[in-house]
Amino acid sequence: MIKILKSIIKRKITDFYETKLGTFYFKQKGYCPCCEEETFFIAKNSWLRDYFKCLVCGSLPRERALMLTIKNEYTNWSNLKIHESSPGERGHSKLLKEKARFYIQTHFYRDKALGTVINGFRNENLESQTFQDETFDLVITADVMEHIYNPAEAFREIHRTLKPGGAHILSVPLVNKHRSTQKWATMNPDGSPNFLYEPDWHGNPIDKQGSPVTFHWGYDIKDFISTCTGDECEIFFIDDLYYGIRAEYIEIIVARKTKDNA
């Protein structure tokens, strides 16, 4: 009887939000892979990719999908040497910082010396890194590779810094899906973007102006990475409401550096 009443109340609340207030409302009970807590996932906007948040930690679906993939593919992740480029302050980045013993965070400050520490972050350009060969077990990039001007060089550099058996695990919005990847912007001599199509910007944790979108990737990113590095690539699509993972552009890519292509 109690369950029936709860179901009725939940339905009435949802109807109220959607019909009376004209507001989308979605709530799901589950477990968050990022804060590792039983929680509710709530969205008040139909664009779940940016609005379906964990009530405890505020993580988003792509962050939960990334962390769940790390846990599923590398169960010993907390003892691995991990490099994350351009981390955020929530979601998988927060958990890795708290529990991964050998975790380093980097940002790219264009006007500062590479390899130096700035505001607690090591300054690294993904296209030209100062790390030694075969340094890391995992390299993590979350919605970063759509902002790189020379992704081929960045993928090669990430491959170089990975140990044999290591992997680059990344989220990137595959907006072109089955269509071919498009270069969206080139870099002007002064470092500003030269957009080839409509200007497109995303948020940047260290720059209020944001980051220009330089590529609209499709599923052919898998072949692009393999061609650049020889890595074995898989694209994972997770749709699991228990973990609060449901949204558009939710794919996670795992590019593994095998001993044969070291």
What are these regions (language model features)?
Residues 1-29:
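Membrane-proximal basic amphipathic "stem/tether" segments
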Residues 18-27, 149-262:
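S-adenosyl-L-methionine-dependent methyltransferase catalytic module, highlighting the catalytic core
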Residues 25-31, 47-51, 78:
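Short metal-coordination and nucleic-acid-contact micro-motifs, chiefly zinc-binding Cys/His arrays
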Residues 38-39, 61, 89:
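Cys/His-rich microdomains that often coordinate metals
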Residues 41-46, 64-67:
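Short Cys/His-rich "knuckle" micro-motifs
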Residues 59-74:
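Short metal-binding segments enriched for Cys and/or His
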Residues 77-191, 219-222, 253-257:
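Conserved SAM-binding loop
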